A protein has these predicted regions:
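Glycine-rich segments within core transmembrane alpha-helices of 12-TM secondary carriers
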Residues: 148-171, 407-429
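C-terminal ends and interior cores of transmembrane alpha-helices
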Residues: 94-112, 354-367
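Extracytoplasmic gate region of multi-pass secondary transporters
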Residues: 40-44, 226-256, 270-321, 418-429
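Low-complexity, proline/glycine-enriched hydrophobic segments characteristic of transmembrane helices
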Residues: 248, 423-522, 554-564
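Central cavity-lining transmembrane alpha-helices of secondary-active solute carriers
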Residues: 63-78, 321-334
Length: 564
């Protein structure tokens, strides 16, 4: 595998006559995932009220959306080149349909435990279907458009923010305004599901370069090697420990079991690849994408947390729609940025990391709605190109891996969001908010502190707020704001004047905790910027960024070490 001797001109020419149809079929597939995820997030409160779930139970159901996706995309990516794209599409469509039947089964007459199982497994299967579709769509589009992967993968992934916008608007109108039953709302994701099923039906799917060359699974894994597998196995070990721990109740034993499973998987990859260390470049890309998952998927909830506390709930929804709409629009512009402005994919990533860092720092200083729109616009531009452009770089540089590398990369990003991004930011919020209130008003902190400390990886335990107590204060603020709005008072800060001194102290400390959390979070894209800058220097040193293509081994030069 060698770089092409001349940097090919960016071209939209596809390798198959039905390429555009397959592209838009993949678009609808990920759109279905976005619509379903947005609506599902909006009806969690409905499930809590109707079935009496605790916040912890709802959190576990939501977490099934991360775990299911990871299993779908990693397993799908490993077998994709061997069984073909078509069979995986059929499997994903069947899983989407099955998830709907399971999720719609609960009724108020059932026992809570029965309803919980239905919703958990319905969410899990929905996520497995989403992951399976990404295991198809990412390598399929990369194969169809080999000379402009960055552009077309960005178009493909524009469907995710589009789905979030559509799902959020539908949820706002049908739930908040019209009070429709949650089952009717959730059923709407079946519309784009039927759409991608129709568009994929009867289509011929091309084979990847690796599949065309007849590479074995072991050969496809060689660039991943022990280094790349180590990233995945460590994340899987942490994830499995977190899932099994509540069932067994023995943290040390569970942690040992999780890392044992991760170790077995790592050894299996070693045997398959004859213990090849893999590409250092791909290892670096995997680590960078771990950070992408943490900052892109893990951060949004905390930005919404700040906006939801500073402004009205409706204004918070508009800000979320604003950032998603920016992402959707800009993902159609990757070709212009690469072709007209002369940015390489790695150059795009460097710029985006800097913007994301600046945007998070601006978001931490939000004081008015106008400032919020500006700050979140900068952050949205920054995070727009991370995910699809990272997939494009991995696909450009490692065609021998077929669907494996980019599917593992997607799994790494999602696992990172679920076990590092969201939990890490939650820990930071607990730590900063608790420390702030304890310093400013120890008596109020003693009243509002959580019954047990928060833990995260190797960091010291931190005591935050009791979720129920601070939640009552936040709900009170939203109720007062709604009442004031009906009298013509639209200043969100006016509601804070009606809180008791103790409530105001706790509420303000929570806001300060949110702000400090976003500042701490900005170190992630700052680290990413340094990694991407090093990659930019590396590619400059070897003559510039170029895609590579599989060539016969006899024609390949023999480098001293594998780097990329």
């Amino acid at each position: 595998m060698t770089p092409t001797t001349n940097n090919p001109e960016v071209s939209n020419v596809a390798i198959a006559p039905n390429a555009k149809r397959l592209l838009w079929a993949g678009f609808f597939a990920i759109l279905a995932a976005g619509v379903g995820a947005a609506i599902r997030g909006g009806i969690l409160d409905n499930w809590g009220r109707e079935f009496g779930f605790t916040g912890s139970q709802l959190g576990v159901i939501t977490g099934a959306g991360f775990s299911g996706f990871c299993f779908g995309i990693i397993i799908g990516g490993v077998i994709c080149d061997k069984i073909g794209y078509g069979k995986l599409v059929v499997a994903a469509f069947a899983l989407h349909a099955l998830s709907a039947f399971i999720t719609f089964a609960p009724s108020s007459a059932m026992a809570q435990s029965t309803v919980y199982n239905y919703l958990f497994w319905g969410t899990f299967l929905f996520a497995v279907a989403n992951g399976t579709l990404e295991a198809v769509a990412n390598p399929l589009v990369a194969t169809l458009f080999p000379n402009n992967r960055t552009h077309f993968l960005n178009i493909l992934h524009a469907s995710w923010p589009a789905g979030l916008v559509i799902g959020s608007v539908l949820g706002w109108v049908l739930d908040d305004k019209l009070q429709w039953n949650w089952k009717i709302q959730l059923a709407l994701f079946l519309i784009p599901t039927v759409g991608y099923g129709i568009m994929f039906f009867g289509q011929h799917f091309p084979k990847s370069e690796a599949s065309q060359k007849g590479l074995s699974l072991g050969e496809m894994f060689k660039d991943v090697g022990m280094l790349g597998a180590l990233v995945v196995c460590v994340l899987l070990a942490i994830f499995l420990s977190g899932i099994i721990a509540p069932l067994i109740g023995k943290p040390e034993a569970v942690r040992t079991l999780g890392y044992t499973i991760g170790g077995v998987l790592l050894i299996a990859v070693g045997i398959m690849t004859r213990f090849s260390m893999g590409s250092i470049l791909l290892f670096v890309l995997f680590v960078a994408h771990l950070l992408v998952g943490a900052v892109e998927l893990g951060t949004d909830g905390w930005i919404q947390n700040i906006t939801g506390n500073l402004f009205t709930s409706e204004q918070g929804k508009w800000l979320f729609i604003w950032t998603s709409a920016i992402m959707f629009s800009l993902r159609f512009c990757a070709n212009f940025i690469e072709k007209k402005l002369g940015f390489s994919p790695v150059g795009i990533l460097v710029t985006c990391a800097i913007l994301a860092c600046v945007g998070l720092n601006l978001a931490s200083r939000i004081s008015s709605l106008a400032v919020a729109f500006m700050a979140l616009a900068v952050y949205a531009v920054g995070k727009t190109f991370f995910w699809p452009t990272m997939l494009a770089v991995a696909s450009d540089r490692f065609p021998r891996t077929g669907a494996i590398a980019i599917s593992m990369m997607g799994g790494i990003g999602m696992l990172s969001a679920g076990i590092i991004g969201a939990p890490g930011l939650g820990y930071a919020k607990d730590r900063f908010a608790g420390e702030t209130l304890q310093k400013e008003n120890p008596a109020v902190f003693a009243e509002y502190k959580a019954p047990s400390p928060s833990h995260f990886l190797f960091f010291a335990p931190a005591t935050g707020f009791d979720g129920k107590k601070i939640g009552e204060v936040q709900q009170k603020v939203q109720t007062i704001r709604a009442d004031l709005a009906r009298t013509g008072v639209t200043d969100p800060q006016a509601a804070l004047q009606k809180l008791t001194p103790e409530e105001r102290a706790a509420f303000d400390a929570g806001i300060k905790g949110d702000r400090k959390t976003l500042v701490a979070d900005s170190f992630i894209p700052a680290t990413m910027a340094l990694i991407y800058l090093c990659l930019l220097i590396y590619f400059k040193a070897i003559g510039g960024y170029r895609p590579v293509h599989i060539v016969p081994v006899a024609e390949q030069p023999q480098p001293a070490a594998t780097v990329g």
